[in-house]
Amino acid sequence: MALPILLDCDPGHDDAIAIVLALASPELDVKAITSSAGNQTPEKTLRNVLRMLTLLNRTDIPVAGGAVKPLMRELIIADNVHGESGLDGPALPEPTFAPQNCTAVELMAKTLRESAEPVTIVSTGPQTNVALLLNSHPELHSKIARIVIMGGAMGLGNWTPAAEFNIYVDPEAAEIVFQSGIPVVMAGLDVTHKAQIHVEDTERFRAIGNPVSTIVAELLDFFLEYHKDEKWGFVGAPLHDPCTIAWLLKPELFTTVERWVGVETQGKYSQGMTVVDYYYLTGNKPNATVMVDVDRQGFVDLLADRLKFYA
């Protein structure tokens, strides 16, 4: 039986590819998709969800727009990474359907209530919507199987020296998620920076030759340009968000550890840092499964295999 999931995202090139991967995978039942501000402004990320679902001919999936800003801070966006639209590069279709007439939290709550079994929440943007759901609907915590997030890092940040972008945008929300008591799976930069897509991988996707694989290749063409900056030392572009979906499909591709994670909300230099108690120094019980390594070739092969679904 397919695993029911709720996808909360802020598309964003890698979010868009996570949607493509999820909807090409019969093991997953995508119940709804919600959008958050993050990689771009809230109206643009919502539009990008609708554009992607129009492209994939999945306008049956309920969509709702979420929080327009973080819980306690002003919004930061990553337009330098994702461009003016949030999905610069390919020519994507205009949306052919409208979002639900409700908020992201309302759609999430409705989806959880109506599901016969606990639902996995996959969150690939800032954690604002998920935190609002947890705070406003404590009665639904038992309907959440786990929360799989792309965010954080044990080591280096990518937005500040200490912080990864998604967590930095709304650290208070991320702290609520990690301390919720619900199992959290963290795909942080420690693993996503190893999940790099090289130029030859992009050409492999393009050669699959269907409209969706072509769009994915064009998304990656644009995404790679930002990551060519020598400061990163990358061979390709790290495909952060699809690591969450890939872990659900093939957990054997990933090495994980069980650790306690907290989020720094106050620090002078470290706001948004995910503090991972790797050596069990705090005495706190582990609250997260933390991804630390990935079989890069296996990850690329999975993407290539699932892109053939759209032939």
From Swiss-Prot:
Alphabetical keyword list: Glycosidase, Hydrolase
InterPro entries (UniProt xref): I/U_nuclsd_hydro_CS (IPR015910), Inosine/uridine_hydrolase_dom (IPR001910), IUNH (IPR023186), Pyrim_hydro_RihA (IPR022975), Ribo_hydro-like (IPR036452)
GO biological process: nucleobase-containing small molecule interconversion; purine nucleoside catabolic process; pyrimidine nucleobase metabolic process
Gene Ontology cellular component list: cytosol
Active site per the UniProt annotation: H240
A Pfam family it matches: IU_nuc_hydro
Gene3D superfamilies named among the record's database cross-references: Ribonucleoside hydrolase-like
Enzyme Commission (EC) number: 3.2.-.-
A single MF term (Gene Ontology): uridine nucleosidase activity
Function: Hydrolyzes cytidine or uridine to ribose and cytosine or uracil, respectively.
Family under the similarity heading: Belongs to the IUNH family. RihA subfamily.
Record PANTHER family: INOSINE-URIDINE PREFERRING NUCLEOSIDE HYDROLASE, URIDINE NUCLEOSIDASE
Name of the protein this chain belongs to: Pyrimidine-specific ribonucleoside hydrolase RihA
Organism, scientific name: Shigella sonnei (strain Ss046)
